[in-house]
Each structure stands twice: as structure tokens, then as C-alpha cells.
Amino acid sequence: LIDSSTIDVDSARKASDLARAAGLGVVDAPISGGTAGAAAGTLTFMVGGAEADFASAEPILAGMGSNIIHAGDSGAGQAAKICNNMVLGVSMIAVSEAFMLAKRLGLDAQKLFEVSSKASGQCWALTSYCPVPGPVPTSPANRDYQPGFAVDMMLKDLKLAQQASASAGATTPMGALAESLYALYSN
């Protein structure tokens, strides 16, 4: 059984326990890469489950993706997905704020992109989803802001990350702030 939904870690672990009790092999294998990655066959799968179950699932996942990462036991795929998307959510906000500040300071967006994409500000949110038209031809900003990953989907993942943070006793103030901001963007 391969579960590629993005759900909370505890539910993924419970589903795994139920599947194993029924004699099934199971992995949680949430996906990153969006519709473009699906079309290109370059999806990333973050896989949680027993080593033997991962070995059984890997050839199937390899038909859809180019990055298949065994993150650990049951629930680890979900944990990797929500942690990764928390990084993305926070970095998208930081990149957007930096471009807004640059504009107010009179700095050309292309020049900020050239600097940040070659310096310590380099990140996927900048080089793939730059929020201003021009620097990245394939970004939503150059496609009339047609999303590849909707605000509400990011909000869902940030909520899952905050739920996991509370459950694990982890403090993630930037993740919490990002969740609050995406809730505002969603309305």
C-alpha cells in the first residue's frame, strides 16, 4: 500500500499500523514537484516505512519520480514533507518581502535576483518561484500569477507542521508566523 497523500504524522503512523495488522506492506510517500514534476516524471517522493516495504514500493515510485528518498520508519515521509514545506513557506515570505523592500529602496528586481541567486540568499523559492515578473521566466509571476501550488495547500501543510510541532514539543515561531500570514493570504 502506497499512501501519497499529505496528512498528519500521527494519522500516517496509525494507518501504517492498521495496514500491517491486516498483513499489508505500507509506506507513506508524499510528493513534491507539483504538476510540472508529474508531467516530467521528476517528482520527489519522501518515503516512510519499513526497509522491506520501501524496497517493494521504490520501483513503482521510480516510474513517476526521479528522487525517491527513504526518510525512515512509518510517518517519516509525512514528517519530511511538512518540514520541507515549512522551509518553503517561510522562504517564500522572505523572498517576497526582500523584493518589496528592494523596490522601495529603488533596487532593480533583476539586480536583486542576480545578487541573491549567487549569494547567501539563494534558495528554491527565489530561483524557481521568484515573485516578481522578469527574473525567472517559468515562475508564476511570468504566467499571470497562475499558481503551481496554491496558497490554501501551503496553509494546510503549515497547519500540519504546527500540529506536529505542538505534538513533538518543538518550538517553531517562524513556522507559526508563516501559518498566520498564509491564513491572511488565503482570505
Regions found by a protein language model. Name each.
Residues 3-85:
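Rossmann-fold dinucleotide-binding core
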